């Protein structure tokens, strides 16, 4: 099987029928749909079960787990996946009807690329709003890792990364006791140290940002998961390929969220040279507290 289309969900039963109908329209059929229910209290299980009685037949595999956050659901789904490629499809988003076919064709072309440097770990395409407007400013058609995408080619906004399943098994999200959020960029940056992506200039993912979602409350979410936030920014200060100004911003954000630590929060160190970022980090933290109080 080529694809695992993976949907993490938490109390989004009302959105799943639309997502199912969109998947039924895919022109490429060599995929399974893996749904990991992150401890929902609504009727998600019954909704998913109703799909199995309908005509559109592709494998639907449903798993329920204790609530731990999206990143833990991804780890769970990766372990259950049967597909060679792993595509994360959030419950409020959708794929254009030819999306999987485009990705499959691009993936076939990977075999003809010369083997030099890092291995290719997946495919990366454009995200767009439902009106067709591309999100951010992607400007590359070729091969690059996630760090090069942002800091050499100047790509902004979300992209749709479709990784080899074995790559995500090699680089799981850290699961920190008491925290329910981990930035995807932490793992994408780790993957970039070993693997590149085949980028192609096609819209393969349509995204909505729902009110009350993770994106809408990202500062508060990061404050509630300070260890994962610190880990992300601390590692960014040490990554080759990230320019000094970006590493300085990362150091400022490290201190910004370190000040949210609880006694039980694991310690995440940062180099002594970044003590200079403490004061601006403190000011940002105080502003966060004032704004969110």
Regions found by a protein language model. Name each.
Residues 12-25:
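Short, well-formed alpha-helical segments that are part of the catalytic scaffolds
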Residues 22, 37-47:
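A conserved acidic beta->alpha catalytic loop
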Residues 30-39, 61-65:
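Short beta-strand/loop segment that forms part of the nucleotide-sugar
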Residues 65-81:
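Glycine-rich, basic loop-to-helix element that forms the pyrophosphate-binding segment
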Residues 86:
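Short aromatic/hydrophobic "clamp" motif used to bind/position activated sugar donors
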Residues 98-136:
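Conserved donor NDP-sugar-binding/catalytic core segment of glycosyltransferases
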Residues 129-217:
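Conserved nucleotide-sugar donor-binding catalytic segment
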Residues 186, 201-293:
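C-terminal subregions of glycosyltransferases and related glycan-biosynthesis enzymes
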């Amino acid at each position: 099987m080529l694809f695992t289309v993976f949907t993490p969900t938490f109390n989004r039963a009302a959105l799943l029928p639309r997502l199912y109908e969109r998947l039924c329209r895919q022109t490429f059929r060599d995929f399974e749909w893996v749904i990991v229910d992150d401890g929902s209290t609504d009727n998600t299980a019954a909704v998913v079960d109703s799909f199995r009685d309908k005509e559109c037949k592709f494998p639907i595999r449903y798993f329920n787990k204790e609530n731990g956050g999206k990143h833990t659901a991804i780890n769970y789904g990766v372990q259950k996946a049967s597909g060679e490629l792993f595509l994360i499809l959030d419950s409020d988003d959708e794929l254009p009807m030819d999306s999987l076919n485009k990705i499959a064709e691009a993936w076939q072309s990977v075999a003809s690329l010369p083997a030099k440097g890092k291995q290719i770990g997946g495919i990366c395409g454009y995200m767009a709003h439902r009106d067709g407007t591309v999100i951010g400013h992607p400007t590359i058609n070729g091969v690059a890792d996630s760090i090069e995408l942002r800091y050499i080619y100047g790509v902004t906004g979300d992209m749709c990364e479709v990784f080899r399943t074995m790559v995500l098994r090699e680089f799981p999200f850290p699961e920190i006791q008491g925290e329910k959020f981990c930035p995807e960029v932490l793992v994408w940056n780790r993957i970039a140290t070993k693997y590149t992506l085949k980028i192609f200039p096609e819209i393969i993912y349509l995204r909505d940002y729902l009110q009350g979602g993770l994106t809408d409350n990202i500062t508060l979410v990061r404050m509630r998961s300070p260890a994962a936030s610190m880990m992300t920014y601390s590692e960014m200060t040490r990554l080759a390929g990230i320019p000094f100004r970006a590493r300085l911003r990362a150091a400022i954000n490290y201190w910004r969220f370190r000040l949210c630590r609880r006694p039980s929060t694991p310690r995440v160190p940062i180099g002594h040279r970044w003590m200079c970022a403490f004061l601006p980090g403190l000011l940002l933290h105080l502003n966060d507290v004032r704004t969110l109080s």
